[in-house]
Regions:
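Domain-edge interaction signal
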Residues: 1-201
């Protein structure tokens, strides 16, 4: 497994661990969109430099390496797959929990970056996350221009959030606040106005 795929696998494992704290059953498409949005915002939120390659297919995305990593997790019995659902098994917690006991370790550091992001997205409904995904400027531009493959480092969302932060010029507002404001803007101007009610904070 190459380095970028290995890092993706670690993040996918930590996302599943974080998500399973509220429910062991996770919609695989929502999970994939969480990963996508995390990579497109991580350089803004945390200064991260990891990349994923993304293929745009029929108005949706395929993350290179995602399917094979999911299959690997399944074969190791960390998860079960039931249609569009990922069911997190106890084996995943048995693997991850001991690794997080070292507070100064790289795995724990990644978890502390991922956990607040998961908490933020989980405060919205899955349907709203779907709307955010289709309203995200990188995906919109790639779709309009007919781009079939891109790297997460080409994120237009990072620039949008950075510009918004610069205009506010307020040291008390952190990066997660900026992301929340953007998501609330989508909630008010796209989600509710198009009749997609039911988003819950």
């Amino acid at each position: 497994m190459d380095l970028s795929k290995s890092r993706l696998a670690e993040k996918m494992l930590l996302f599943l661990y974080s998500l399973s704290k509220s429910s062991n059953t996770i919609n695989i498409n929502t999970y994939k969109r969480y990963i996508y949005l995390y990579y497109l915002t991580s350089s803004f939120l945390t200064g991260g430099s990891d990349n994923i390659d993304i293929v745009i297919e029929k108005g949706d995305i395929r993350i290179i390496g995602f399917d094979s990593i999911i299959s690997d997790f399944n074969s190791k019995e960390y998860i079960d797959i039931d249609g569009n659902s990922v069911i997190v098994n106890d084996e995943l917690e048995y693997l991850v929990s001991p690794l997080l006991k070292n507070d100064s370790g790289a795995f724990s550091y990644q978890y502390r970056e991922i956990q607040p992001f998961v908490n933020l997205l989980q405060s919205y409904s899955d349907q709203f996350v779907f709307t955010v995904f289709f309203s995200e400027p990188t995906f919109k531009e790639a779709s309009l221009r007919g781009i079939k493959q891109m790297r997460s480092s080409n994120s237009r969302l990072k620039g949008l959030l950075s510009s918004f932060q610069a205009k506010l010029n307020n040291a008390d507002i952190d990066e997660y606040d900026i992301l929340t404001y953007w998501m609330d803007y989508i909630l008010k101007n796209y989600y509710i106005e198009t009749g997609e009610n039911g988003a819950e904070r």
